């Protein structure tokens, strides 16, 4: 892999993958993309990238393969099998999976890839669509130091805070903790919003002053307008946060860590899905609190 301009294949051009791949193109990388939606392929072409008709075609000549898909089943579907990445990427290629999946899936993928001579990093991100567009994502990485060092210039084109967290699966473990913190924080903000509204306080003024003190957070900064305007257009969908809460709950159980507050929030996220809100932004946790409080939904 060239240290300056490796040839990149990108699989998965969704809400996160599209702007991230475009930022690589802006940084001077040759990017060939594959996804199932033609409009996303057209967008990549318009940004200066190349598109492929299959995973095999996309990865065959790539130095680096980057994947960004919704969950573990999708990672397994694109990685394994005769048409998958492992059977078609060249020996010596570096596979960087930036999806948010279970730590064990990442560990298993790294083991399978090693048998094919393919190196792997798990590198999930935090920062949402805005962070992807602005190239200021936090990137938490699991894998070997040498592979991280080679991938770091790519990460620097995508994010701002980039950390090697440990061996394979460590990036996913840290991402699971991130999703726990974010969900609990959004839930706390949502409860505060309902409390303030039912108390007759000027909500905008209250959130402004709260965000200037110890209660302030990146979550409140990013989601304040969602609460004020009741704008729940995703963003990061409840469906995906439900998946992530399942990951952190299972992982915590496996290591014997108690997550009492996280477990309650996970159930509230699940309740939103059953009431048809799974496609909304995760700031729609406000709707769960409102239902419990007999307030506006």
Model-based region annotation:
Residues 55-67, 71-119:
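Rossmann-fold NAD(P) dinucleotide-binding segment
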Residues 134-135, 139-142, 163, 167-199, ...:
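Active-site-proximal catalytic alpha-helix in oxidoreductases
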Residues 168, 216-282:
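Interdomain hinge/lid region at the active-site interface
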Residues 1-67, 93, 98, 129:
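NAD(P)+-binding Rossmann beta1-loop-alpha1 motif at the extreme N-terminus of oxidoreductases
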Residues 31, 51, 120-121, 162, ...:
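Hydrophobic beta-strand scaffold residues
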Residues 274-297:
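NAD(P)-dependent dehydrogenase/reductase Rossmann-like domain
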Residues 100-180:
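Rossmann-fold dinucleotide-binding core
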């Amino acid at each position: 892999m060239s240290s300056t301009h490796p040839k990149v294949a990108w699989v998965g051009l969704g809400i996160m993958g599209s702007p991230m791949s475009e930022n690589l193109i802006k940084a001077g990388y040759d990017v060939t993309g594959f996804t199932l939606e033609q409009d996303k392929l057209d967008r990549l072409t318009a940004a200066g990238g190349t598109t492929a008709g299959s995973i095999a075609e996309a990865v065959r000549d790539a130095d680096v393969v980057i994947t960004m898909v919704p969950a573990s089943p999708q990672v397994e579907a694109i990685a394994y099998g005769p048409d998958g990445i492992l059977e078609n990427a060249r020996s010596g290629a570096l596979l960087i999976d930036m999806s948010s999946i279970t730590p064990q899936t990442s560990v298993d993928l790294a083991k399978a890839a090693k048998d094919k001579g393919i190196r792997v990093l798990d590198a999930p991100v935090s920062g949402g669509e805005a962070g992807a567009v602005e190239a200021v994502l936090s990137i938490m990485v699991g894998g070997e130091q040498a592979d991280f060092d080679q991938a770091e210039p790519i990460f620097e084109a995508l994010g701002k805070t980039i950390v090697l967290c440990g061996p394979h699966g460590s990036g996913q473990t840290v991402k699971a903790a991130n999703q726990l913190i974010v969900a609990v924080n959004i839930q706390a903000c949502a409860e505060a919003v309902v409390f303030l509204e039912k108390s007759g306080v000027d909500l905008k003024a209250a959130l402004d002053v709260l965000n200037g003190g110890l209660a302030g957070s990146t979550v409140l900064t990013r989601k304040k307008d969602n609460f004020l305007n009741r704008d729940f257009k995703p963003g990061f969908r409840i469906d995906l946060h439900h998946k992530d809460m399942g990951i952190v709950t299972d992982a915590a159980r496996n290591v014997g860590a108690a997550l009492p507050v996280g477990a309650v929030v996970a159930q509230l996220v699940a309740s939103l899905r059953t009431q048809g809100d799974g496609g909304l932004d995760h700031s729609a946790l406000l709707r769960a609190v409102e239902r419990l409080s007999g307030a506006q939904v």
